[in-house]
């Protein structure tokens, strides 16, 4: 006599139990990872969009959830906070000198941190432009116009803000090329800072001073901040003046090794920064008015970003280490010329 066949109902029950067990195992193995990205002042919108995209990508790839927390402020001040103990898994700062300080002062990243990702670990670029009020009432056309007596210039403090250091060096580099000497460039930049009524700690603070508080005739702005000011504070209230020359700003990113090793987040942190170089990451940069590194993605934004002559920090100043020591260290050129 043959044993009775298993009924279809029993088979369905067994299959359901197996699926439930697999689902429970998958749920149990999935985890939630938290990262802290310590960034500079005007990247809030960029990383709000990027964090959501990366979370979707990582969930699809691994099944794990990622929650990315953000901290924003002047780049130099943010670097100091990380040195003083802020537990950043990654830093996305305004300039290489600030990440260099994490190595030099606290040993949080290796000396060769900049070689670990493409493009010297700078996944997007920007520059410094001049934002003026509607109708350009002070007839500002180029750098020379902002050093005229009586023109009020808004720019953050280069001791705390990365954007301010880029702006300072953009003005210096323009003047040295136009007038032919470092002495003339120093006079030019000194005249510029005589026109600065207040130094905010970061770029976003300066944008608010100019756009909301309506202080100043011209804002020395990150290019993305100029776009955002026109978008967020009312169309037609401001105009962007593209100078004849400016500096190629290359904001870098890095995993903070000592933190991720302790927290066990190294793999996710690396993937997070690597995803900035993906097509989606590059497109998000472009949508937020940062210049993509990818040539293919950059072509899609060719009509957005104006063409202008750009010089690099290496060409004009011998790199960030030399520029930081000469101009922004205690007792450096900025301290000597800024008499407030």
List the model feature ranges, each with a label.
Residues 22-27:
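N-terminal signal peptide c-region/cleavage motif recognized by signal peptidases
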Residues 30-160, 309, 338-339:
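N-terminal segment of the mature folded domain
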Residues 38-40, 113-123, 132-134, 152-178, 192-196, 230-247, 259, ...:
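Short beta-strand->loop
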Residues 128-136, 250-267, 284-288:
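A bilobed periplasmic-binding-protein/Venus flytrap-type ligand-binding module shared by bacterial periplasmic
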Residues 135-141, 160, 173-181, 259-267:
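Short helix-loop capping/hinge motifs at secondary-structure junctions, enriched
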Residues 178-244:
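Ligand-binding pocket segment of bilobal, Venus flytrap-like solute-binding proteins
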Residues 260-340:
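Extracellular/periplasmic juxtamembrane helices and adjacent flexible linkers that interface
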């Amino acid at each position: 006599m043959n044993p009775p066949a298993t009924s279809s109902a029993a088979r369905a029950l067994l299959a359901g139990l197996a699926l439930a067990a697999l689902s429970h195992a998958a749920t149990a193995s999935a985890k939630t990872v938290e990262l802290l990205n310590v960034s500079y002042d005007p990247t809030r919108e960029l990383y709000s969009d990027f964090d959501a995209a990366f979370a979707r990508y990582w969930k699809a790839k691994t099944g794990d959830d990622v929650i990315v927390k953000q901290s924003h402020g002047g780049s130099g001040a943010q670097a100091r906070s990380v040195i003083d103990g802020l537990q950043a898994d990654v830093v996305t700062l305004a300039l290489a000198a600030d990440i260099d300080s994490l190595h030099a002062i606290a040993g949080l990243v290796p000396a060769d941190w900049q070689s670990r990702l493409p493009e010297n670990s700078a996944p997007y670029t920007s520059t410094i432009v001049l934002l003026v009020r509607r109708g350009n009432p002070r007839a500002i056309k180029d750098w020379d116009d902002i050093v005229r007596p009586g023109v009020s210039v808004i720019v953050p403090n280069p001791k705390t803000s990365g954007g301010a250091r880029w702006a300072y060096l953009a003005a210096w580099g323009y003047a040295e090329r136009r007038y032919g000497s470092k002495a003339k460039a120093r006079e030019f930049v000194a005249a510029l800072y005589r026109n600065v009524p207040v130094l905010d700690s970061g770029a976003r603070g300066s944008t608010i001073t100019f756009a909301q508080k309506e202080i100043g005739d011209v804002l020395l702005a990150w290019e993305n901040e100029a776009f955002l000011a026109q978008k967020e504070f009312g169309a037609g209230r401001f105009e962007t003046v593209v100078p004849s020359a400016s500096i190629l700003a290359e904001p870098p990113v890095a995993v903070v090794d000592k933190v991720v090793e302790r927290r066990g987040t190294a793999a996710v942190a690396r993937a997070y920064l690597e995803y900035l170089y993906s097509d989606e990451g590059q497109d998000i940069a472009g949508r937020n008015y940062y210049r993509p590194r990818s040539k293919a993605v950059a072509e899609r934004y060719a009509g957005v970003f104006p063409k202008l002559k750009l010089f690099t920090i290496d060409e004009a100043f011998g790199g960030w280490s030399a520029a930081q020591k000469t101009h922004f260290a205690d007792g450096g050129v900025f301290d000597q010329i800024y008499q407030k």
